Amino acid sequence: SDTTQAVRNTRRLVEEGAVAVIGSTITPNSLAMIDVVAEAKTPMISLAASKDIIYPVDAKRFWVFKTPQTEELMARAIVADMVARGVKTVGYIGFNDAYGEGWARYFEAELKAKGLELVVSERYNRTDTSVTGQALRILARRPDAVLIGASGTPAVLPQRTLKERGYRGLIYQTHGVANPDFLRVGGKDVEGTLLPAGPILVAEQLPSSFPSKRVALDYIQRYEAKYG
């Protein structure tokens, strides 16, 4: 999560003649790396989510690509599910960095478009060990649902704290937690979590009519055959 180190590593790679750079897996680092790869005219494939990594497609971002879905796309899916479940009021707590701010921006815009009310918005750092203050402020507003704009295992902390403090509403996470480590660290505290994910993660559960099911299953089979 050190943007300075990410830039340093990227510069070293392009100076050593790398024909492409794969990374970073997080939004702040990926954004910091753009200037380096653009200057070197070296393609970069980011594994982070933010739409800002690739848009607007200007002279610098011409060299940048990414694999995950954008937060804008996933925010639409989350809000659509909230509407379907009758949610009226929503709370948000996200990383105090480009990932959390990007999610807050697109999520709030989608809430407004669908007529839902954002009643509280909080931030925390990836390395924080307590979010009690933020959780209490969220609980005071009594939202029907809360979205945690975080990724990886640090996304567990707000959810665990809300549960421990008695929150009984719906808790949503981003596609940044769609991995075994989140489930391992979260344990019972993340039971019932709602989150969006790309079709490849649930390929076997998709109906046969789903357009990309066959392609997803083929990819999984090939990947597991080679890498286990």
Residue ranges and their predicted role:
Residues V19, R61-P68, L136, E204-S209, ...:
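Second-shell loop/turn segments in exported
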Residues G17, G115-R123, R142-A145, Y167-R168, ...:
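A local structural motif
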Residues T3-V19, A80-D81, T129-R142:
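Short, well-structured alpha-helical segments in soluble
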Residues L162-G228:
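Extracellular/periplasmic periplasmic-binding protein-like sensory domains
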